[in-house]
Each structure stands twice: as C-alpha cells, then as structure tokens.
Amino acid sequence: MNNNYESHAISRRSFLKASGVVGAAGILAACGGNSGSSSTAASSGATSAPNTTGATPLKEFISWESTNRELESWNMLYSQMASDMNVTTNLWEGLLSFDCYGKAVPSVAKEWSHNEDSSVWTFNLRDDVDWVDVNGEVKAHLTSKDFLVGLEWVLNAAKNQANNTSMPNETLVGAADYYQKTSDMGDAAADLTYEDMLAAGVGVEATDDYTLVFTCKNPCPYFDTVAAYTSFYPVSEDLITELGIEGFRACDYTNMWYNGPYVVEEFISQNTKSYIPNPNYFGADDVSRFDRFTVTMISDGTVTFQLYQNRELDEMDVGESTLTTIQADPNSEYNQQLCEKRPKKFSYQMHFNYQKNNEDGTPDDNWNKAIANTAFRQCFYKGLELTNWYARTNKINPLKCENDYYTMPGVCYNTKGEEYTTLVAKEMGFDKESYDGKTMIRLRSNNGDIADLKKQAMDELSAIGVTFPVHAAYYIIAGNSTALDSATVLKQCFTDSFGDDFIVLDIKTFVSSLTQEVRNPQLQSFVINGWGADFGDPINFVGQEILHDDNAYYSWYYSNIAKIVEAGPADWQKDLVAAYEEFTDLVNTAKAIVDDTDARYAAFAKAEASMLNNVLDCPCYFEVAWTLTHANEYSKINAMYGPCNYKAVNWETSEEAYTTEQYEEFAAAFDAATQA
C-alpha cells in the first residue's frame, strides 16, 4: 500500500465512545471489515437520512481527495480556493445553505426577504447558534454582530489582504470605499472595527441581535446568492481578540471556532482528515450527519479501485482505464454498479490567447494573425468534433460532456422558470436540439462540414502573410501520463476535424506552474479552463471576458485582449476588437437592467450569443464522470454557486453499492422534481 495510507493514531474526543490506533484500513477493521457500522439511522441527531431504496445506510463514510488539492487554509473568510472550502463548509456555516436541487435554504438565517426593488435585503437569524471549539465545547453565542465583524474583516485590506472583496464591493453601498480607505491606511487599518465600518456608511446594519439588513448599490434580485458566499460569513470578535490579526488569518482546526455540522477529529496533511458531529450544532434536528466522515488523500489514482474494493473508500470516480478493466470482464459485479454522476458546476472553455509569444519572447504573429480572423475561430466552434476526447472523461456517454455555451446551466432562472442557457440556445438556434448520444449539437446544422469556412480563413490569412499549417501550442504538466493521453486524443481530434494542412496541435509541457511558466510569458495558443459561479447571475460568467474592466479576469490574464486594446490593435486585429466591443456593450446593457429580471437575462443571452457567434472563446466540456459508490449523488447538495457542495449532510447511503439501475431511477426522479 502507498505510504500515504500507513497506520496512525486517531485521538478521540471526550464525547466519543471509542478510541484506538487505526489507519484508513484500520478504521474498516474496527468496524467489522467495512467502511462503517450499519444501523437504521445513518446519522447523528434526530433526523434520519433520506432512504428511497430501503437499504441499510452507513453511519460512517470514507470519501477521497487528490493530494494536489490538499487544504491550505482553514479560514473561510480568507481562502479563495475551492479545495479549502470543500473542507471548511463542514465546519463553518453562513447565512444560507443549499439543497440537492441547488435551491437556497435556511442556515444561520431562518428566513430572508427584500423590498420591492430588491435593493434592501433583511435576514432574520436563528437565536440558538453557538460557537464551539475543536472539542465541541461552547465558547460564545452567535449574534448578528458576528456577521458585521466578519464583513469588516473581509473589507479590511490590512486584515484579509484583499481576499473575497469583489462581491461585497460590487453590491453593497459604501463597501468599495471602505476597502479603499483601509488599503490607503496601510497597517493602521488593523485597528479598525466593525463600528468604523458602519460609521463609514457601508450598507449593512444589525437592527437587533438577530436581524441583519443589507443595502445594495442598485436593485439586486440575486443578492441572496451573493450573501451565501464566504465573503459574508460570520466570525466572533472574541476569537480574533484571542488569536490576534495574524493568528486568526492563519488559524487552523485546533484553535478556530466552529458553528457547522462537524468538528475536526483528526487531520494529517496529505493523508487523512476526519470529522465528527458538532455536539452543539444548531441544525442537529434539521439535517442528518454521519458519526464520522473521513477524507482519504490519494496521490496515485491507480490505487483508488483497490481501496474501493477493500471498502477503504465508499465512493470513487471511475477513470477510462478502470472502466475498460471492468467492462472487459463480463462477470465483474461492478458492471452493474457503474453509476453516471451529475455534471460538476464548472463550465470549461478553450480560452484563446490573442497575444501569443514564441519561447524566445518574440510575438508569434502567425498564430496571432490567424486567431484574430473570425472564420478561423468559427472553425473551432462549428467544426471541431470532440467525441473521442469527451470519452476520456465519460467513455460510455461521451456526448454528455458536450458544452455549447459559456455560462454553466443551472446558474439562474427567469421568472417564467426558464433556465438561462435555454435563452442562449434560442439565440443560437439550438432550442429545438437535445442530446441524442450520437452527434454534437453545435455541429448538426452543417454536419461538421467547415470546408467553406476553412477556405475563407486560409484565403484571408494567406493574404496577410500567414503560413499553413498554423501551429497551436497546448501545454500539459510534464510527466503526467493521463494528461498526455488526453492531449494526444485532442491532437487527433484536430487532425480529423481540421486537417493537418490547416491547424496542427503541438503538445508542450511545463514543469510545475502553468501560470508562471506558460500563461505569464504568454506561450500558449489556448488554455482549457473551467469557471464556476460565485453567485446566481450571468454577469459572473460573461463579465470575465469584457473590455474596459480591471476585474475581467480572462480578458487580462488568458486572452490578453485587454492588453491589446490598451496598447492599440494592429490593423489585422481591428475586426477582433470590434467584436469584443460589441460584446462588451451588450454585456453592459444587460448589466444596467436592474428592475426586470426577465429582460436582464434576455439581454445577457444576446450578449453571450454574440460572443459565441464570433467565437471569442470556444466552449469545451462539462465534467460528467462515472462512479462506484455507496452514496446517492442526487441527495448531495448541488448548488451552481457558493461553497456548500461538499457539506456532508442529508446524504442517502447504502451498505450495498448502488446499481446502475438505481442511479437511473435517481436521475429520473431528480429531473422530474426539478421540472416540477
């Protein structure tokens, strides 16, 4: 067994019944050779977990994470990394949480409302929430003041170092000004308190111990999804006083205070982390919890299947090689247990670099001229057949991974209940199309035939000195065989779709940092990257691509189009810049509509369609993987934004692995409930 799984001591807390020396395998042995003791209630507390199959549920559960995604910060207010929040969401609660349909549900806030134009939002808090230490002992009572303290911490540059400021700065009256004030003050700002924030006019107030009122700059009908993010989480002033500014910023599980469903039982970096129920959790009667939830860190994916077979994991993602192994044996019990997961919340796109450099630092004008040409870019969207590449993620149903839009489906709905990307589909003429398992939706209108576009692009580009084939540099991390295999398949997709006389994919490698070695020196032709929403509005996606905005992440750091505009475009870039200006104007027009949600989303759909028709970047895929599991994925939190998806509450589980048939029933029931 890999040395990440060697035995180690686990120290039980005083309120647990058992103690002993166990490892990932030892936990199983202590429980009779499986991942958890079975009982009629799969949770700690009065609420039973959902059970739609009559199965024997699990009281303990072992999940996994890759070692390259180990937690780096325990501070929910400070961290901006999903890998951190996947842990701390189990320990730290904010105003709202979410359910398995992605709907906001009460957490510390028991109810919330807004005024007529959605510019003022009121959150009524529970009066039974306590802060506890790692031993589950009560340290303080939580009131509305703790949310004021938390927000001041986030907005204070001397305390939180600018992390997680964008959402309050964009939405709340006075927030950006207060942040700038603290930035200008330097270290002296560390002495400011929430009272200074209120005196500065930031749009938040605690009208009593259990009522919070936020005032937005403009009507903001989606503010509840903003307030669910970590920027608005609470912290006790007493804890900050106890630890000090530096100490709280760097707090860990041993000295932080908890108000979430679990406390940390044990943490061994790059090995395991385990949570046990918070004995003073305010929601103990509202949600089900495990008696122990363990996350095992995996450095080598080749051992995952063995761990699952040994019941040292209760769930695993099934990669292409494992899937091939299972399907090659018709007698394997696992053939009937392969379950397809829901898409993860990230929309992946091919982000073109319009200002590429050669490795010697000189401009790669052959690529730069080519990618600035509209017909050349349209060949990607209308002609790149990716089914074989999708099969690297989902071998059985590869086209489930097809992504034709920029925004992730499910982020927001209009007042008619129409999901936002269906509005984009109408603008693109795809609204009558649906998944058929055979052909990519966006290639159907022309059957993937780009002969005319290819000729147009080659004629126009040859006239300005471009030579063919155009070479596209695609970087992967060195020494990773999985990444190399996927890139090799993608290279063949380029050959089959474009022809090697037109575009050739060159696979290149970096040692450790894509940002430092590739993106900063601008060596890539494109990067495939995913974006997940922080809140429920299209601006969270399309706003990353516009011009004339310092916060447009992709425009500055991936496509470099903002730098081109800042310096002044070349003649051969003027059509590209014009397309970006049109898109930017459409986004800003949509953003300005703050009193009509339907009109706002319709306007954003037109903007997104403009981006797609001009292929300013190219949507690629969704992560839709297969799993072997003892947990019903459809019972887990499934929000398209916020930090809560890895919170281990209300999970339906089974001592016996779920079957393919059961998962198909789960999916059908979920889809029916969603539509209803």
Mark where each language-model region is:
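Detector for C-terminal structural segments
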Residues: 381-425, 478, 482-492, 516-676
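N-terminal secretory signal peptides
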Residues: 1-10, 14, 18-30
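Ligand/substrate-recognition segments at binding pockets and active sites
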Residues: 269, 307, 397-398, 434-533, ...
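Alpha-helical secondary-structure segments
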Residues: 139, 144-149, 209-215, 261, ...
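Aromatic- and charge-enriched surface segment that lines or borders ligand/interaction sites
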Residues: 110-175, 213, 304-307, 366-372, ...
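Gly/Pro-rich hinge or "lid" segments in bacterial periplasmic/extracellular proteins
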Residues: 186-191, 198-201, 207-210, 215-294, ...
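Extracellular/periplasmic solute-recognition and catalytic clefts
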Residues: 67, 265-279, 294-361, 387, ...
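N-terminal lobe/hinge region of extracytoplasmic solute-binding protein
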Residues: 64-117, 257
